[in-house]
Amino acid sequence: MSKIKKILIFGGSFDPVHKGHIDSCNSAIAKVDPDLTIIIPNKIPPLKSTLHASASARDRLNMCKLAFSNMGNLKISSFELRQASNAPSYTYKTIQYLLKKYPEAKLYLLVGYDRYCDFNKWKNYKYILNHVTLVVGIRNTNTLDLKDDKKSIPVLFPSVNISSAELRLKPNKEYMTEPVINYINENGLYAENHIRNLMSEYRFNHTLRVAKTAMQIARAVAPKKVKKAYIAGMYHDVAKEFNETT
């Protein structure tokens, strides 16, 4: 087995993972030419407004495995997801872990331009800068403004006009791979996001109670079918308030 000299690190919520993530990763790989790329779903992003991702850690990990399955020399790491519960994912800890695991490798960290601009807010950002080379994704050459004190490599990201929030409401084949969409549908991911927009608040609260009760019953009589019970409970009244124009 050849020695790993260059590692590209790509972390994020991946909630859900979409083609923008895949294309950005491919662009960075083409630029850096790493021996290994490591995709790292994070547990709780410190600089995001929400404390928890909508999908579970396990589901986001599984979606990443599906989305990046066709890419060679790539691993999906659960390192950050295995950290203490309710603790933010700090990149510097991941860097420390990877340096111990691959002591002879040079590390490259892929970040978006927005994250690059607030990089000084990252926990122990100076440590990170001393141990990795930043690979900064930009949407066009006019946005490039890399500081001289940061050893950074610009890479042009493809333009994907979609947000993860929109995809949580409605998965879209144009922006997501079919295996990921199938996984979302089969496992009832983002069901609450979806259902909330299809019914009144009264009906939605009723639906949540039914789903909770269905899960409680399933845990008692059919523990392996708890997720299916939840999905059935969430969607049992989905068409209740539909009319002829819905």
Describe the function of each predicted region:
Residues N197, R219-T246:
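Divalent metal-dependent catalytic cores for phosphoryl transfer on phosphate-bearing substrates
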Residues A191-R209, E241, T245-T246:
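Active-site flanking loop/helix segments enriched in acidic
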Residues Y92, A211, A232-Y235:
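Generic structural concept
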Residues M1-I195:
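Nucleotidyltransferase catalytic core that binds NTPs
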